[in-house]
Curated annotation (Swiss-Prot):
It is an enzyme of class 2 (transferase). The gene is ZDHHC5. Residues 35-38, 170-191 are extracellular. It comes from the Eukaryota. It is found in: Cell membrane. This is Palmitoyltransferase ZDHHC5.
Amino acid sequence: MPAESGKRFKPSKYVPVSAAAIFLVGATTLFFAFTCPGLSLCVSPAVPIYNAIVFLFVLANFSMATFMDPGIFPRAEEDEDKEDDFRAPLYKTVEIKGIQVRMKWCATCRFYRPPRCSHCSVCDNCVEEFDHHCPWVNNCIGRRNYRYFFLFLLSLTAHIMGVFGFGLLYVLYHMEELSGVRTAVTMAVMCVAGLFFIPVAGLTGFHVVLVARGRTTNEQVTGKFRGGVNPFTNGCCNNVSRVLCSSPAPRYLGRPKKEKTIVIRPPFLRPEVSDGQITVKIMDNGIQGELRRSKSKGSLEVTESQSADAEPPPPPKPDLSRYTGLRTHLTLAANEDSSLLGKDSPPTPTMYKYRPGYSSSSTSAAMPHSSSAKLSRGDSLKEPTSIAESSRHPSYRSEPSLEPESFRSPTFGKSFHFDPLSSGSRSSSLKSAQGTGFELGQLQSIRSEGTTSTSYKSLANQTRNGSLSYDSLLTPSDSPDFESVQAGPEPDPPLGYTSPFLSARLAQQREAERHPRLVPTGPTHREPSPVRYDNLSRHIVASLQEREKLLRQSPPLPGREEEPGLGDSGIQSTPGSGHAPRTSSSSDDSKRSPLVKTPLGRPAAPRFGKPDGLRGRGLGSPEPGPTAPYLGRSMSYSSQKAPAGVSEAEEVALQPLLTPKDEVQLKTAYSKSNGQPKSIGSASPGPGQQPLSSPTRGGVKKVSGVGGTTYEISV
């Protein structure tokens, strides 16, 4: 019955217990009212006292067996059985006194039942040492109330026997008054007692046997130890003493407590929180902090109610101080996006508008990850306007753009000077030659002498997609020339040759190490590679054709010499990155048309796979002195020798394209002439070379070309 609290009331459950109580109390009351007075007179006054004591004992045990907790185990909470439920095996085995005893998993209570424990289907609880569920007491009989149930049976049997015996004695004494009321009530009580005596006496005898053998009704009925040994028995006397004399078992369920309502008087009220003392604890991506904000309680309540509907905070921004390359690329992307959205932005990509701000110190020239390697915008306005100032203030000028003059502002057109013989687009190098470890890994594998490599197809795609340069026009990414490029052994550069992409310090170190004498080799004739006119505009094609006509009219140069490494490798050396010295004034450069600013005479790169590969001259190879005048040469090239028997058209075709892989190499912080620092090239010319001719000296002829181009040729 204690388990019934809090559950739905079922009247049928109380019918047996109510009938038992009525018969017990009613029959005993009639016995004491009609039979005991006559027995006290006829037999002894102790008869009513004895029956009263036995009746009280029966009533006490009945009450204890009905209302006492039989030993119910509490059910597992939801957080306790998360790991065990739906994955636990049905049985677990434990060993008790050397005998294996199974423990069954209870799906209702969600735990393994201890030995001798069973789940009561009526009470819906697991009861320790479950015996049976008795409907006469409306309770389960378990470890905690089995003693009272057993004593109830014993006392009830004794009481029934007493009532029946003393009633029979009363009838025998009053045989003449069988028609009387007292004798009739006594005979009725005897019938009730006689009817209940048979089942109660039989049940009592059964439990006496179970107690003596140390078993429960459930174990006896199910036959768990029918063919084996009971591990729970301790002998007859010990079993009886354990049931009757042992201390009561502990209670596993707490007693229900009623909630107490306490009235709080004004002295015990909580103080009001002021608006300035509200402490808000925030959590921002794992960082907790306390902020004191001047907010009212109403605003905090509104914020709390809207917190469930608010969007999550944005992810934290990356730490740009830790990743130099990421910071550089983000800066480039932001600047390029802002430039593309401008009103005066040209339709072509604007990568030429960026140039690296190099420092004149050796540290910034040698370390590409320094802070001076950030790409700046607008520094070109500070460039020196004369060659003398540019030699004192070394810096790099950006590559020429193919944009029309109408799309460029006057300031921008003046800040980027054009070099007619500048080769290759370095827009990719301006954007990606600084700041990332991936590009440093490429710099270690790229050859500084300008030889092409087989793995520049992906970088060529970047050049095509990222910038519009002269190389991307001559050799598109889908050209088969990309597929046929093969890397060969790196030729030894000639004396006085300096890579145009090395820093000043590295160039000086390598210049001191290279002193091999030049060995003249025989020239090799080869047809020039045809120029691809597919991607060129009409004006550029006309300029190229005009220059080719001029080159065909010029006579071939007498004996040229090749550098020693090119005779065997079959790989042409790059004639520098196209920083030829400027001889015209800055005013002439600013007035030139966009067509003049496009490098002319840059045919497509020839295939390298043929055995009789193209072999051109190196930048530092000596040339004979004054030769017949020919067009298409600047004064920086007039002081060098050319291989004999090779026409100028072939020589122009020998100039290779600057591959995108070469664009990634580091550039020196000095203005260059023919790939060499101007100070070095002018101060110490190599053997077999003549000093550069000045435009003011004799022997220099100026020839006007297409579009107002002026060529200065040594005679």
